[in-house]
């Protein structure tokens, strides 16, 4: 960011007009000044994620206090175990309720560049396609991001069918044609 003002100085006045906010831990800290709960899961079965749900809910309440117009606060979570082994999860605070995904354990990450964009694109798609199902929209966003980690380059070249297959638990990695 190199525009003569800090990201916080530019974004804080604008954020008051949003209905939906999304980001990872650094964005929430930089723009709103609040530190989300750390995500330190070490594998997909790690229960520390569930143990932190009350803190994630408090985080969501704090976002809504700071941005009263905001109806949905998405938080994408990543714990980098090694340079190519990452754990992903996400939470959504909406209607005074916390929703969460499971944990994706990506052991052979190809390229993480663009994974945040894939999450946001998946979130927008999910909100449009599942307008009355925030849980499904959240799961779609994270599945799109998880799959992007397996694709080289900045763009997510996976299909809707591949994202939905992952959402349904198909993690076999088998090629389907």
Which residues make up each language-model segment?
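Conserved phosphate/ATP/ADP-binding segment of small-molecule kinases
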Residues: 1-97
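Alpha-helix boundary/capping residues
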Residues: 18, 35, 144, 170-171
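Conserved post-catalytic alpha-helical subdomain immediately downstream of the catalytic base
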Residues: 83, 103-170
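Structural signal for terminal/edge beta-strands and the immediately following C-terminal loop/tail
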Residues: 172-177
């Amino acid at each position: 960011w190199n525009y003569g003002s800090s990201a916080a100085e530019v974004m804080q006045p604008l954020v008051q007009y949003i209905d939906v906010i999304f980001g990872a831990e650094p964005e929430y800290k930089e723009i709103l000044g609040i530190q989300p709960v750390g995500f330190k899961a070490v594998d997909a079965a790690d229960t520390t994620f569930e143990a932190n749900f009350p803190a994630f809910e408090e985080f969501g309440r704090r976002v809504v206090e700071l941005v009263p117009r905001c109806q949905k606060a998405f938080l994408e979570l990543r714990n980098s175990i090694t340079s190519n082994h990452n754990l992903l999860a996400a939470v959504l605070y909406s209607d005074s309720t916390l929703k969460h995904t499971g944990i994706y354990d990506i052991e052979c990450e190809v390229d993480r560049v663009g994974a945040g964009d894939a999450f946001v694109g998946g979130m927008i798609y999910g909100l449009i396609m599942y307008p009355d199902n925030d849980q499904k929209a959240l799961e779609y966003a994270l599945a799109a991001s998880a799959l992007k980690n397996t694709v080289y380059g900045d763009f997510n070249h996976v299909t809707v069918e591949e994202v939905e297959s992952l959402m349904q638990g198909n993690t076999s990695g088998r090629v389907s044609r």
